[in-house]
Amino acid sequence: MIKSLLKKLIPTKYWETPGSFYHLYLNNHAGSYYSQEGEDILLSRIFGEQTEGFYVDVGAHHPRRFSNTCFFYKRGWRGINIDALPGSMKVFQKFRPRDINLELAVSEREQVLTYYMFNEPALNGFSKTISEKRQTDVYKITNTKDILAFPLYTILDNHLPLGQSIDF
């Protein structure tokens, strides 16, 4: 009820743009888990009640929405969140201040890749073929950007705290 009332009061542009007001502030997911396919549920079974740990989330997307690591962050874990979407780390800095939040692209070698951005940011990616297949009447590529990508080992060499082990 509150969500529908707010939707009537807040201009449409805030509901339809990537990183919109809705996704940032109102989309509180049911239950304690956040991932899209239950990855955090499976990981919680592996790590049990462990209240400290370290994760690396490549393609982190959002600190809560479809997040594989939000559940663990709320338990006291820390980690590195990596996402290529320009501007994506602003919301991570707000909701995940204990984490290392990096707006970077990951690739098998240092190279420039074309990043395909959709009106639904969960669909963003680097594959032209997959991006073209994902386009529908609802989901559209809104922009492309050439982004310098780095191997994960280079990113970890530069940003992983000295002596820090990675749980997942």
Listing of model-derived features with the role each one plays in the protein:
Residues 1-168:
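Phosphate/nucleotide-binding beta-alpha loop and adjacent structural elements of enzyme active sites
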